[in-house]
Regions:
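Conserved N-terminal alpha-helix of the aminotransferase class I/II PLP-enzyme fold
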Residues: 34, 38-76, 100
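Short hydrophobic alpha-helical segments of the AMP-binding
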Residues: 61, 109, 383
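Generic structural signal for buried aliphatic residues
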Residues: 95, 379, 383-386
Length: 414
């Protein structure tokens, strides 16, 4: 029997790759080893009912982000989203889902049986009509959403700030807007030197904090990883002490990168100065990424002609190598972006689910959240009518598709 995954990971690690992908420790030595991998002992506290060293770590998180309360999560921002929505359900059922949201939001909003409304923006929206509002800021491409209109709303405001965990540590980066959001979800491992799965939740409200802790006790694994928690602890302390200097270096090197990039590309302007989104000007970004990988350079993701790199204090020194490699690549293959159109919603009450080959699912009603990953934003959600155009896109081998079961798509029976 061959250990397939271990072999693949070992081969990758031994190749000394240039990594512009999460987790944001980028393969450095975190000084955490398996001898520290323990369970709840007399001295090590308990995440679900923290009152010792874990509680102290969570207090550090709150202090670092200038909030009253912080919670640690070891099973990723997906669990943090579930906890936030479970907490919101205590207020009421009416949920506004604002703009593009991660698949986990769609999934848990359905599991928790919210009465869901959708809007691309806050135009013509009265926030007080809802019990809760959830939005993404920053998004996968470093754009921050303006939520000033939500400042005095009676709705519970949830910010999925998974990609903004580093914002608090440098004055040139955007504000997390924790003064407006009642609950803020962070994915530490995306932008900080934290093991995969490290996430957190912030709030300034005592009653919400109590409800979040209660929800965590229900939804979080009772076997949290102490190694992940230790990496969060170290990262928060390191960034609180040195984040301003470290990210100044990152931002400066990105500015130099832009100057050395040839005119076949341009870097898109972002609110997050560390999220590098390189436009290949309608050339096939997937082919460019394959050529970069042949040079042992790995990006976070490709989105048509956009190449996304997560730049951190631990990989910014490799930006000249990325610029040089891109400048040597000159492909002629064009690519058109697929515009995701909002699908027609169909009533799915009391219908059963079956699984079809995706090519046979035209004009059927989707029973899952389906899209490409990254960025993890669904193209289809529960109740959407499946079109031929969407199927053509999802069957393009350039993408990693989520939501399919052994290549089949869940649909409701006619």
């Amino acid at each position: 029997m061959q250990n397939h995954l271990y072999t693949a990971l070992k081969k990758y690690a031994q190749s000394n790759p240039i990594r512009f992908h999460m987790p944001a420790h980028n393969g450095i030595d975190l000084e955490i080893d398996t001898s520290m991998d323990i369970t709840e002992l007399s001295f090590s506290d308990n995440l679900i009912e923290s009152d010792g060293v874990i509680k102290n770590c969570e207090n550090n998180i709150a202090n670092a982000y200038s909030t009253k309360y912080g919670l640690m999560i070891t099973s990723g921002a997906t669990t943090a989203i579930a906890i936030a929505l479970h907490t919101a359900k205590n207020k009421g059922k009416k949920l506004l889902m604002l703009g593009d949201l991660h698949k986990s939001v769609h999934n848990y909003a359905n599991v928790l049986a919210f009465d869901i409304s959708y809007s691309e923006n806050l135009d013509n929206i009265n926030p007080n009509d809802y019990d809760a509002i959830i939005f993404t800021s920053p998004n996968y491409f470093g754009k921050v959403q303006d939520i000033q209109k939500l400042k005095n709303t009676t709705a519970l405001v949830i910010a999925d700030s998974s990609h903004g965990a580093h914002f608090a540590f440098n004055s040139k980066l955007p504000d997390l807007q924790t003064d407006i959001a009642n609950i803020t979800v962070l994915s530490f491992h995306k932008t900080l030197p934290v093991l995969t799965g490290g996430a957190g939740i912030l709030t300034n409200d005592e009653k919400l904090y109590q409800m979040l802790v209660y929800s965590r006790s229900i939804l979080h694994t009772s076997s949290p990883s102490y190694l992940i928690m230790a990496s969060i602890d170290n990262a928060i302390c390191e960034m609180a002490l040195n984040g301003e200097t470290l990210y100044n270096q990152v931002i400066s090197e990105i500015d130099n990168f832009k100057k050395h990039l040839c005119d076949r590309y341009f870097v898109e302007d972002n609110d997050d100065k560390t999220r590098l989104c390189i436009s290949a000007k309608e050339k096939d970004g997937y082919k460019i990424a394959k050529l970069l990988e042949s040079k042992n350079i790995y990006l976070e993701t490709i989105y048509f002609d956009i190449l996304v790199a997560i730049v951190t204090p631990y990989n910014y020194k490799h930006l000249p190598a990325l610029a040089n490699a891109l400048n040597l690549i000159d492909i002629q293959d064009n690519i058109k972006r697929f515009e995701i159109k909002k699908a027609t919603k169909i009533d799915t009450n009391n219908k059963k689910i079956e699984f079809l080959q995706i090519k046979n699912a035209v004009n059927r009603v989707c029973a899952a959240t389906v899209g490409i990953y990254p960025p993890g934003i669904p193209m289809l959600t529960v109740g959407d009518l499946i079109t031929k155009q969407t199927i053509q896109f999802l069957t393009d081998k350039k993408h990693t598709v989520f939501g399919l079961i052994d290549g089949k798509i869940p649909v409701f029976t006619d």
